[in-house]
Amino acid sequence: MPNALKRFNAEWREGEMTNDGRADEKLDLLSPIAQPFAMSTPQLEINASRQFVSWLREQRLSLAFTTYQTGKLFLLGCKPDGKLSVFERTFERCMGLAVSGTQTLWMSSLYQLWRFENALPAGAAAPGGYDTLYVPQLGITTGDVDAHDIALDSDGKPVFVATLFSCLAAPSETHSFRPLWRPPWVSRLAAEDRCHLNGLAMRDGKPAFVTAVSTTDVHEGWREHRRDGGVVCDVQSNEIVARGLSMPHSPRWHNGQLYVLNSGAGEFGRVDLAAGKFEPLAFCPGYARGLSMVGDFAVIGLSTCRENRTFSGLPLDDALAAKNVAPRCGLLVVDLRTGDVVHSLTIEGIVRELYDVAILPGVAMPSALGFKSDEIRRTITLEE
């Protein structure tokens, strides 16, 4: 391990996180059923179901999720003693996530795309057992284009949804972004969020499917079609492959099938491409947004319904009332074979909205650097 990294490790203070990202208040996490930990009011409480941590260990993975309302990137893993590890850092309006192996993590945020790289050599660990240290190595300034989902193409280059401009985009070395594709119903690029294009699924390293809240071509026209105007569109053919959805998000291509969240109805399901039909697999007791797949499992992000017009009057309201449950914030693990929720994690307090969820394969206990403390000044590694 490089000497500079050794020096940093000696100064790392185990288990210390704060609401603003500084390492000066201890947040005492966590047991397999996590205990509440103190933060500035209102507090944050994370509770995992009994086998959640065991599932992480069995699948040999960790999880990352973004909470754009509070501007937090959370990393969940397993401590050596079998307890849940929770790590967080602050990035304003953090949104979409994309992963490449165990080394690279991409994230969209308020006006930048961030590429994180793991600074720990293979087999090394920071004090406390962290086996991965994601360092924000590259920041790409896009301006506030309301970037949502981000994904990586076959060359490992990012493709993202520029929601404000209703298009798919790539980074530019000289401009805010380079437009790649826009839906056939959008007549021109304009900073008008015409259809609330938000989700992106890749297939064979290419953009394959997107979700939009409507097929409108006027300034914020989607707001009038939140209940049933949502669509899934094939990027290659420009054909709509599913209609009648309520604020769909997070399309994902997995094992030869297209999965999507029908967020406004609280449904997770797949799209029958031959029939052009959405088929629900599981009910989500919250506004579902953020989806990542591994093997026979889906990890889904849940948000409580915001107290504004955008999230009011949706089919989800009726479904929750019919089932006599309140909306939840957290994560669900769904078995794709049965549609059953097999594990869960609930979040209460200051965090009420999640945007994206990513699986970190081969990572046991992840950590990251942010910009609110001087840790990033002391983390120096040399390329060999």
Annotate each PLM feature.
Residues 5-384:
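Sequence-structural signature of mature extracellular/luminal beta-sheet repeat domains
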